[in-house]
Amino acid sequence: MKTEELYTMIQQKPVILDGATGSNLQKVGMKPGVCPEEWILENEDKLIDLQKSFVEAGTNILYAPTFSGNRVKLEEYGLADRAEEINKRLVGLSKRAAGDKALVAGDMTMTGVALEPVGPMKLEALIDIYKEQAKYLLEAGVDLFVVETMMSLAETRAAVIAIKEVCNLPVIASLTFQEDGRTLYGTDPVTAVVVLQSIGADI
């Protein structure tokens, strides 16, 4: 999908995004503390049925359940060596659910390891981690990317840079803001928009 096509789509009608996948999967048996990606691959029908219901309700863009599919998060469950397989299989499930009625976005989020100087993660290493996941998602056939539930503008920036180094697909980036209107690290929405637009985020 080209960025212009996404913009045209938005101009023509309201675009409805994915539903609450995680909480809905918990309602059908996914226990807290498990690796969501692994659980989904062991319960494929649960995900497909849920996402088909999203499509039937009018969803235009499904999020592949690759939210924490980066190798840092997967390593917490001893699954880092399966990152490629996991990401590609999960995209495949969402594509089955979408059929020809919805687009499928590669979904990415934080690694859980803070960037320097707050934490030990180096920027270059973080970009490489996100590039790896973005490459797997691209090869699996996603239509666009979503970087979501981010608490750090610096990490969001790293994810967008990584995706744009891998491909030219559209990128939707979003951050989580607290009651004071700022992220956990103190970033206000205007600053976030200016920074992310400057590096290629499309929405």
Feature map (PLM): residue ranges:
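Domain-level signal for soluble alpha/beta catalytic cores
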Residues: M1-I203
